[in-house]
Amino acid sequence: MPIVIPKDLPATETLENENIFVITEHRAIHQDIRPLKIAIVNLMPKKIETETQLLRLLGNIPIQVSIDLIHPKTHHSKNISEKHLLSFYKTIDDIKNEKFDGMIITGAPVEQIAFEDVDYFQELKTIMDFSVTNVFSTLHICWGAQAALYYHYNINKNILPKKVFGVFSHHININKGTVKLLRGFDDKFYVPHSRHTEVKKEDIEKVPELEIFAESNEVGPYIIASKNGRQIFITGHPEYDANTLKSEYYRDINLGKHIEIPKNYFKNNNPREELIANWRGHANLLFSNWLNYYVYQETPYSYISI
């Protein structure tokens, strides 16, 4: 089934070249199908890149999905044109009276700043309140997960001695037969991480409403969920393209920053050799399981009932 996106969205050409079925909102109106309504709160600076990454994953399932792109109006984006935001994005004010089957809140490169000092955090709190009352299930990614754990459950982040950067092995630490989100997961799977902060396992375990579904011996908890399944927290970046960590590495090198080579990413740990992208199967399974089992099979048919 197709993913419904705004006309002329830059990601369209890339997705079509990858044989991902996309249609415009105008065409979708004439089809007698009730698509899943998904809001993507895109906090990443490279908006088009993140749009493409997420739409690729959402478009790889047999369910029609309609997308609304959301950005914080209280933040001035330096890496995207105002025209792009005006053409393709909405704000929380535009959607405050709507209901959504699902929402994705992305990461943001602000994890070394205190939450309350992030210029759009007050607006993000409004969005997170909205996600509780007007969204059936919300998937939070990296800093988005840390911000939500802080706001909803008073779990603060902790600065790491050095950046977690690379691709890391993870395992399931719960009976995966009882958790639909984990269906089909390998016993060991890989996920990219790129962050300066963490949420400690012991802090999560103090909250009875939360469960840790999967973690890494090297980088800690990875998938955390509320027991009702309506809040999912992902501490890594499964949506990343094969080249994203490489781009981040050379960006920091060119800025004169001290940055270690991303772990378990380049063959022989050598940036001059080919990279190893071994997380795409996991990423597709994670997003399809979330959409199928936590959104599609659970959300009411009528938006009013959400």
UniProtKB/Swiss-Prot annotation:
GO terms for molecular function: homoserine O-acetyltransferase activity; homoserine O-succinyltransferase activity. CDD domains: GATase1_HTS. It is an enzyme of class 2 (transferase). The record marks 194 as: Important for substrate specificity. Pfam families: HTS. Keywords: Acyltransferase, Amino-acid biosynthesis, Cytoplasm, Methionine biosynthesis, Transferase. Its EC number is 2.3.1.31. It is found in: Cytoplasm. Substrate binds at residues 163, 194, 251. The active site is at residues 142, 237, 239. One of its GO terms (biological process) is L-methionine biosynthetic process from homoserine via O-succinyl-L-homoserine and cystathionine. Belongs to the MetA family. This is Homoserine O-acetyltransferase. It comes from Clostridium tetani (strain Massachusetts / E88).
